Amino acid sequence: MTDIEALKAITTESIDLENVPVEEVFQHLKCTKEGLTSNEVQERLTLFGYNKLEEKKESKILKFLGFMWNPLSWVMEAAALMAIGLAHGGGKPADYHDFVGIVVLLLINSTISFVEENNAGNAAAALMAQLAPKAKAVRDGKWNEIDAAELVPGDIVSIKLGDIIPADARLLEGDPLKIDQATLTGESLPVTKNPGASVYSGSTCKQGEIEAVVIATGVHTFFGKAAHLVDSTTHVGHFQKVLTAIGNFCICSIAVGMAIEIVVIYGLQKRGYRVGIDNLLVLLIGGIPIAMPTVLSVTMAIGAHRLAQQGAITKRMTAIEEMAGMDVLCSDKTGTLTLNKLSVDKNLIEVFKRGIDRDMAVLMAARAARLENQDAIDTAIVSMLSDPKEARAGIKELHFLPFSPANRRTALTYLDGEGKMHRVSKGAPEEILDMAHNKLEIKEKVHATIDKFAERGLRSLGLAYQEVPDGDVKGEGGPWDFVALLPLFDPPRHDSAQTIERALHLGVSVKMITGDQLAIAKETGRRLGMGTNMYPSSSLLSDNNTEGVSVDELIENADGFAGVFPEHKYEIVKRLQSRKHICGMTGDGVNDAPALKKADIGIAVDDATDAARGASDIVLTEPGLSVIISAVLTSRAIFQRMKNYTIYAVSITIRIVMGFMLLCVFWEFDFPPFMVLVIAILNDGTIMTISKDRVKPSPTPDCWKLKEIFATGVVLGAYLAIMTVVFFWAAYETNFFHNIFHVRNFNQHHFKMKDKKVAAHLNEQMASAVYLQVSTISQALIFVTRSRSWSFVERPGFLLVIAFLIAQLVASVISAMANWPFAGIRSIGWGWTGVIWIFNIVTYMLLDPIKFLVRYALSGKSWDRMVEGRTALTGKKNFGQEERMAAWATEKRTQHGLETGQKPVYERNSATELNNMAEEAKRRAEIARMRELQTLKGKVESAAKLKGYDLEDPNSNNYTI
């Protein structure tokens, strides 16, 4: 039997690879522990396929038609059926042109939605490809990082802490693993997997490191077989609920208008059947914001692409709106606020064991480090050697214990040149100290050294050593000796202080969450200007803390927490959410996953584990806090575009329904349905550009405020409807425009209205005039709703302006020159066209003040702050007490010499000025320190601080005067 034929037997699952001995697994899979060659991989990919589940292929036709299947489209489809099925009689031909127009409008919206979503889907697929799970496998005799989708049965893979198991596999020699199988079996606790056991695709490694041989991939895995049994659930997010609420409001408004028209037309006016149908069609076609789902989804998709360009990949689209409302960010210190580029000052190493010097301590620490797949600490330690190979020179490695959150240390068991067994371990000082046989004797000195390091912003790394006389690799060995404490320095990022200040001005409170000591956290907070109001994780356990306040208040007011474990992160997020905060949380490890899932916005930082990425909403591809704050601003801009459009959509619904209903009720004026279609089509073309509009993000956290959206929309829409009625009255009932502008007189009292031909002629001209008035001011409204302050001072996007000008040029030409009997309009000439533009300009001038009045009524803000535009004129919500935070931050920055007074960070030159001030403050401090060191007092104090002596304590016996 050839190798291929033998492997084909595996695909039929006639061999139980989960239960046969591991040696037989290699025989059946025709592989060795040296892995596969590239040719073997290609053959197996052809046979087994890629390591991914089968994707359901969606029909493009059904997907296209799906954009016509929503409540707003149903109303338009009902209008189309009315036009073709009910609009007959009354001495008029069948309403085919209206039917065709409605279908064209539906097709235009569906086409735009289909194309944009397809483009967004392709872009999203490309972005998500960056997040595709990776796996370390032996190929052609070398370890390589490959896409997990390229794994095949027979591959040798490495599994370590934080990895999501990429395929079903059997474990080889090594230490037991702790595997979280909750996603597969529902087991809440991790299970122990010994060498030889099976691990399944989709589970997570919680502890340990080992090699394994892949036995099944793709649809043949345990997860793949169960996937088809799981029904996908439809989750209705907050964004969808908002869309539904706005859509329902518009539909209800139309229903009310139609009910009034039915009662008046058929009950009071006793008019014909066809007249009523045409008037109802006007409300149905013009009132429905048919483009709303398209505009909002396209806006969000384009926004997600921009976020990705800034280094923040959005896994869940609705996370954008939550990011816009985030008011508290719980940030890791290491790698986010700091560079995560550790260095060790050899001169400061404190040695505790006789016979060991600092060079030997460094060598021992390097032995307890990995030479490959190093973390930041391992890199810092090994880089201190002249040659990294020195770490293993003259010894034989027997067993390496990798770091895990449970023991917080690494260890190496090895044989020296004489064949004696030794073990060396490095890790968290408390863990190392607990192992020492003489911990009670050295405890005070160790803690004093740790505190001395912490006061200088240095982390401590403990180092211990033991002999293993019995020669048992897994035995306990002899007593542990505490060898040394190594100081680790992780410098803050150059932009962290400025970014934190920027966040405070944006209403986002940044809290430092770190596993380091409290003194280190406070020193880092002081350097970054974020405050030193920090607490140990023990203060989270009960309300009996030294501050005498509840834990909730403590968390809300704290600048950060030190000595934090992953479970503390979860508790912090939970309590902040209970205080009505929208909370973001950064994380990178497997144990951060619960907190990332719990947070409103889980943010996996650069180089996070697969488990952390899987639990997050946003994945960063660049390090640092500035990426997050930039993403916040971008999210607010995206959210602002969506909110601007929803206000516009509600306004247009009200102005169409109310305006044409009043004309019908009081003047029996019948506006042609086809011209409403023209308005809708031109509006759609213009409004689509709002997804790329230039907007000013909210200076404070923002969220959906339906009360504001509906109130602003109703008032603005009602105003425009009333102005349409005023225009109609002035043109149809008076000589006002004729006398002032010397244009053709449309006053009905100057015509023989009993003559049907004359009346029809006048009505067609009035329809053309009303069409231009409604079209122009309706589209101009978007410039009002898109701006936070005066619309003429916030420059709109180029595409929006061009689209508006083209649409209104078309509308003006139609009104001035078009004679369309089928559409019920007749040309009014360029004179009347100019008059209507002047009327609409005057109408437009009152829109901004009305917008301010509505927001003033909703928020209660003073007039000065209202028109200033910097507070968004929206209902004020206590987003983490932003005034208190901003005042506190200013005070702290002033104390540190970083700022001389109030200066908003969003001024154009503020970034440069802040950098200059920071450099100047740093230079002044350095000059003062150097001068002080030249004095006897300065030298004594400097030496005392270095030794850990307290000169302020008169009872101290560490020195004499």
Curated annotation (Swiss-Prot):
The protein's Enzyme Commission number: 7.1.2.1
Subcellular location(s) of the protein: Membrane
Cytoplasmic side: 1-64, 118-246, 295-643, 694-709, 786-797, 848-961
Record-listed Mg(2+) binding positions: D588, D592
Entry keywords, A to Z: ATP-binding, Hydrogen ion transport, Ion transport, Magnesium, Membrane, Metal-binding, Nucleotide-binding, Phosphoprotein, Translocase, Transmembrane, Transmembrane helix, Transport
Coiled coil regions in record: none
Regions that span the bilayer: 65-84, 97-117, 247-267, 277-294, 644-665, 671-693, 710-730, 765-785, 798-818, 827-847
Gene Ontology CC: membrane
Membrane topology: Multi-pass membrane protein
Positions of post-translational Phosphothreonine modification: T894, T960
Reactions this protein catalyses: ATP + H2O + H(+)(in) = ADP + phosphate + 2 H(+)(out)
Region (Interaction with 14-3-3 proteins): 959-961
Extracellular domain ranges by topology: 85-96, 268-276, 666-670, 731-764, 819-826
GO biological process: proton export across plasma membrane
UniProt modified residues of type Phosphoserine: S910, S942
Pfam families listed in its UniProt record: Cation_ATPase_N, E1-E2_ATPase, Hydrolase
Gene Ontology molecular-function annotations: ATP binding; ATP hydrolysis activity; metal ion binding; P-type proton-exporting transporter activity
Subunit structure: Binds to 14-3-3 proteins. The binding is induced by phosphorylation of Thr-960. Binding to 14-3-3 proteins activates the H(+)-ATPase.
Stated name of the protein: ATPase 7, plasma membrane-type
Source organism per UniProt: Arabidopsis thaliana (Mouse-ear cress)
Gene that encodes it: AHA7
